[in-house]
Swiss-Prot record:
Coiled coil: none annotated. It comes from Campylobacter jejuni subsp. doylei (strain ATCC BAA-1458 / RM4099 / 269.97). The gene is atpB. The keyword Plastid does not apply. This is ATP synthase subunit a. Keywords: ATP synthesis, Cell inner membrane, Cell membrane, CF(0), Hydrogen ion transport, Ion transport, Membrane, Transmembrane, Transmembrane helix, Transport.
Length: 226
């Protein structure tokens, strides 16, 4: 991104400052949106409150399809919705000229993936107990436990890589795609690209949220007979 103008470079041209500047900007936008949505709550929602309630209801619906338990869905709503908001706004500001998407940095995507990884294991242990939770890693056949346990460990660790690199790779690719389009045809032609990249911002946030619910469901929802 050295050749692109960033507003953050007016204060400091370093990559570290740019990263934290845009992270702070995303946090500020999220706080402002939350304040606008809750400033004057009404029984019949309007404006930003209506959008916020529609978003939260969509996240709840996603959770119900994944977890089944209404109690669990609502319990994890704050985490999943917050992650979705952070990922979406981090994606979307990268589309705007003069700004850089924080999710185009592996620092943020890896941090978010580690938060999800640690939290769903913590919830799984709290719901089932330490021994019972890790006993599931050994599979139903005791003879194959020495083989299954390391495979399960690697499988869970790969989720960190999958969550972080999927988001990072897609948004980094979007940034490069937009940079090429703007360099070749900087005026009317990029408009369809902006529509596509906005859709991708929604899609990547959706994928991150639903995978978080899937991992939480796998850790906390225990089938009868297990």
């Amino acid at each position: 991104m050295k050749d692109l103008f960033l507003f953050s470079s007016l204060l400091d041209a370093s990559h570290t400052f740019s990263y934290f500047f845009h992270i702070g900007l995303v946090a500020l936008i999220a706080v402002i949106v939350a304040m606008m949505a809750t400033r004057s709550m009404q029984l019949v929602p309007r404006g930003m409150q209506n959008l916020a309630e529609a978003f939260l209801e969509g996240v709840l619906s996603m959770g119900r399809d994944t977890m089944g338990s209404e109690k669990g869905v609502r319990k994890y709503l704050p985490l999943v919705a917050t992650l979705g908001i952070i990922v979406f706004f981090s994606n979307i500001i990268g589309i705007l000229p003069g700004f850089h998407a924080p999710t185009a940095s592996l620092n943020l995507t890896l941090s978010l993936a580690i938060i999800v990884f640690v939290y769903y294991h913590f919830e799984g242990i709290r719901a089932q107990g330490f021994i019972k939770y890790f006993a599931h890693f050994m599979g139903p056949i005791k003879l194959l436990a020495p083989l299954m346990f390391p495979i399960e460990i690697v499988s869970h660790l790969s989720r960190v890589v999958s969550l972080s690199f999927r988001l990072f790779g897609n948004i980094k690719g979007d940034d490069l795609f937009l940079m090429v389009i703007l360099a070749l045809v900087p005026y009317i032609a990029p408009l369809p690209a902006y529509v596509l990249l906005t859709f991708m911002a929604f899609l990547q946030a959706f994928i991150f949220m639903i995978l978080t619910y899937v991992y939480l469901a796998g850790a906390t929802v225990v089938e009868k007979g297990h």
